Amino acid sequence: HLLNVLTGSIGTEGGTSPSAWNKFHPEFFDTPPSPDSWNELNWPKEYTLSHYEMSQILPHLIKDGRGDLDVYFTRVFNPVWTYPDGFSWIEMLSNKKSIGCHIALTPTWNETAFFADYVLPMGHASERHDLNSYETQAGVWIAFRQPVLREKARRDGQDIKFTHEVNPGEVWEEDEFWIELSWRIDNEGDLGIRKHFMSPYRKGKKINIDEYYQYIFEQTKGLSETAKKEGLSALEYMRKYGAYLVDPEVYVKNKSNLDNDEMVGTTIKNNGQIEKEGAVIGIEVDGNNFSGFPTPSKRQEIYSQTVVDFGYPEHATPGYRIKSHVHLDEMDKSKNECVLLPNFRLPTHIHSRSANAKWLTEIAHKNPIWIHTKDAKRLGVFDGDLLKITTEIGWFVD
């Protein structure tokens, strides 16, 4: 990336672009406030540079006495099978003091669902609503996934309130499930939850699934105008076509000018940063007020103050100085210490979520030990050998 910065090829034709430029970001009818506290079971202090929540070590955090969970939803998630330390998950999910109530939202019966208090069938792609948008090109597009049988029933003239009325096996549509659950939890409206699920079209009424997506599509740039040319609403257009190209070309967005309304109430600092209500919204360059890049400073950042603030000043600039605790230099070959990769993912195993798909299992029905040829030669190991692997937490035979 630094090379692209130095050659001026960020956001240009033939260059690279920030992913945020080419992915659609919907505007919702309501945005609840963010949590007012830090959840150390999701984001432990030891892993301040992690990009995602550290769910793989959740059982160990709870076992260490850092907290417990009253209610835990596992959504299309099978850690007992997928994660390396599945038995720790079994221990946690079996302990009422660790997990008060475990609900498994899953399209298939699996190892984790076995330890759930409630197993709620989750719809596959053709049984639920969803929005899709990926950075596939220098443009922005949005796609609409919708339950097949619900849309067929609508076209057949049926009045469907909930998707589970027509879904196979009465499977609930996920968006509808969360709306209904949230609404019923705050039955009297005194918990401050219901107000975030009010219809933007029917005052005081609960939002329904059609209104949920109708609002998003009506706020999508150019979609209503395109739909109107065919005598359709934005929602009807997306039901019919399933996709819409929001912007065919997205280049040099960092040079987009802030308009007069955006500049009202701003101050320009000596370093060129344009601030409004305490936030940096753009950058002033040679008298031009640009929106800049999607970074805290609105510039390309080589130095990260965030990393410094989290206590890692040695990593504030780009480099390759992070040495893992499982680096080869840390291994004692005399004790047969190796880098352990207990599981891996073949294409046919689909995120390790398809253990009970017998046809895929027949295609790839082995989970062999992968070992470097040099280590295999040193240990006298050959293809087809049955080995016992021992670690600090147990052993397995494969």
Where are these predicted regions, by residue range?
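Long, low-complexity segments enriched in small/aliphatic residues
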Residues: H1, K205-N356
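Acidic catalytic cores of enzymes that act on phosphate-bearing nucleotides/polynucleotides
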Residues: H1-K63
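Non-catalytic alpha/beta scaffold blocks inside enzyme catalytic domains
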Residues: A20, E40-Q214, G292, V339, ...
